[in-house]
Amino acid sequence: MASLVFSFRKLSLFFHTTRVISCQESCAVLSRSFFSTHIVGDEPILVRDFIHSALYDANHGYFAQRSRSVGVMERSIKFNQLEGRKAYMIYLDKIYKQSDMSWFTPVELFKPWYAHGIAEAIMRTANLSVPLKIYEIGGGSGTCAKGIMDYIMLNAPTRVYNNMTYTSVEISPSLAEIQRQTVGEVRSHQSKFSVECRDAADLSGWGEVKEQPCWVIMLEVLDNLPHDLIYSENQVSSWMEVWVEKQLERESLVELYKPLQDPLIKRCVEIVNFNENDQAKSSLLSKAKGVWSRAFPKPRKCWLPTGCLNLLEVLHRVLPKMSLIASDFSYLPDVRIAGERAPLVSTKAHGSSSDYESYLDAKGDADIFFPTDFLLLEQIDHYCSGWLKLHGDKPKTGKKRRTIILDTSSFMEEFGLPSKTRLKDGYNPLLDDFKNTKFYLSVPTHNIK
């Protein structure tokens, strides 16, 4: 059963058992495909650039190769007709074997109810006296977009549906086409839905600043955003940024450490450290740490969500009145890669999943996905809105945001219809299987400083 649970596209990872690829196997696999080493040319690159290429390279990246495996289920699961968890797992196994898909997203597994919960959250919070504008980043198969538009068509005032627009920002051309087909099944949706095939984190793709209120939806986007890695020799040494370089005369990659100099990394480090307790900065504690680190030196690594910071900086700049709904992992089990907020690097073949021991082994055949520190996400959101000021920031107007972090079960109990995903014995996979995921909601306020 463990292998089919992975097909949830990671969301039930606390059930997930994997086979770790040995160094010997990794080297053998690497010798068959040199894409990962070709990511790095003669000059070193930052870890975030390596990860971006490994995932999103147009020809060899993981999502370019796996876009066809993003499944669209022919029909919704009739949860109320299943006896219990065992019957549910058997049914899932049958679906995956019939479809030959690597994974279905949760919005697909629980359609239309997952998307309906998001739509209800939007309708309760949005100002429906102005045209409703929704952007979805990384829209997958289009099931979320269709579910939200269906719900608004059936439950909102007619003028709200008639005047709404829904824009998907999708980096994959093949997924963009699937989204058009999925949403286009309802003819009245077609004039309201559009796909822009581009990178949402690229400021130039957005054009002029859009001052109208809008919603931005990001489901399982944060986990695949590029991260940077910083390194310290011990508990008190300064952080250094990590670069990836190719070893001379060898088809292998190694890490290179440099003093912090990248502006995005430096901003992210400052946000991470913003709420550091004043006692941690005291000279007495600093001296104690120094003695301890010399007696028991321990290298440190920390993964930084610089891709998230970059994306939110872009969104707040071009959509200053946006409201945000994001859902992702709050933690990942059995992570073997070193560092705080470290990712899982996992590949799947012939129905079984395998975890790599190093992110450097990713070569377009492996998903690289990170846990989301939702409190840090909140800090980044406040920084990008201008409310949180860092040392040395230029004076600027900032708007406070009203935010809330909810477990997936709490979100769906508040905004969804949990009875629709409950099995006969009371087991509810949407509420019971997603303990390692959360929702983040953020809306602008009128408070300015």
Model-predicted regions and their roles:
Residues 2-135, 141-214, 230, 375, ...:
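Rossmann-like AdoMet
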Residues 104-109, 277-449:
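Long, Lys/Arg- and hydrophobic-enriched amphipathic alpha-helices
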Residues 215-283, 343-348:
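A mobile, often basic/glycine-rich helix-loop segment
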